[in-house]
Swiss-Prot record:
Residue span, bHLH domain: 28-80
InterPro entries found in the cross-reference section: bHLH_dom (IPR011598), DNA-bd_prot-inh (IPR026052), HLH_DNA-bd_sf (IPR036638)
Entry keyword set: Biological rhythms, Myogenesis, Nucleus, Phosphoprotein, Repressor, Transcription, Transcription regulation
Quaternary structure, from the entry: Homodimer, and heterodimer with other HLH proteins. Interacts with COPS5 and COPS7A. Interacts with IFI204. Interacts with GATA4 and NKX2-5. Interacts with ANKRD2; both proteins cooperate in myoblast differentiation. Interacts with CLOCK and BMAL1.
Gene name of the encoded protein: Id3
Role of this protein: Transcriptional regulator (lacking a basic DNA binding domain) which negatively regulates the basic helix-loop-helix (bHLH) transcription factors by forming heterodimers and inhibiting their DNA binding and transcriptional activity. Implicated in regulating a variety of cellular processes, including cellular growth, senescence, differentiation, apoptosis, angiogenesis, and neoplastic transformation. Involved in myogenesis by inhibiting skeletal muscle and cardiac myocyte differentiation and promoting muscle precursor cells proliferation.
PTM entry text: Phosphorylated in vitro by CDC2 and PKC.
BP GO terms, sorted: cellular response to leptomycin B; central nervous system development; circadian rhythm; epithelial cell differentiation; heart development; metanephros development; muscle organ development; negative regulation of cell differentiation
Compartments, record wording: Nucleus
Protein name: DNA-binding protein inhibitor ID-3
Single annotated GO MF: leptomycin B binding
CC annotations in GO: cytoplasm; nucleus
Length: 119
């Protein structure tokens, strides 16, 4: 059996500690699992602010809770569904009358002499 040198054992321990301290320094002292909820919270806050911007009728200067924002989003979606469910308006029922020459301004009326230049 080989005897382990106590100096070598300490060196390995120091290397291990220095690797951990580098990892902590790179991560600013937070483990990746601790950073995840904060980034998710930022994402959710961004989503709520984006929803607030997209829904019409939300006053800009007032504070709304997340529940109020979601309720306004739901109301807006329901309003859109009602509008889309309505039948589309058709063309007017009356006959389409062509524009008479008398209804045009004199600048728009081309005399018969000038019409020959067009064709």
């Amino acid at each position: 059996m080989k005897a382990l040198s106590p100096v070598r054992g300490c060196y390995e321990a120091v290397c291990c500690l220095s690797e951990r301290s580098l990892a902590i320094a790179r991560g600013r002292g937070k483990s990746p699992s601790a950073e995840e909820p904060l980034s998710l919270l930022d994402d959710m806050n961004h989503c709520y602010s984006r929803l607030r911007e997209l829904v019409p009728g939300v006053p800009r200067g007032t504070q709304l809770s997340q529940v109020e924002i979601l309720q306004r989003v739901i109301d807006y979606i329901l309003d859109l569904q009602v509008v889309l469910a309505e039948p589309a308006p058709g063309p007017p029922d009356g006959p389409h009358l062509p524009i008479q020459t008398a209804e045009l301004t004199p600048e728009l009326v081309i005399s018969k002499d000038k019409r020959s230049f067009c064709h």
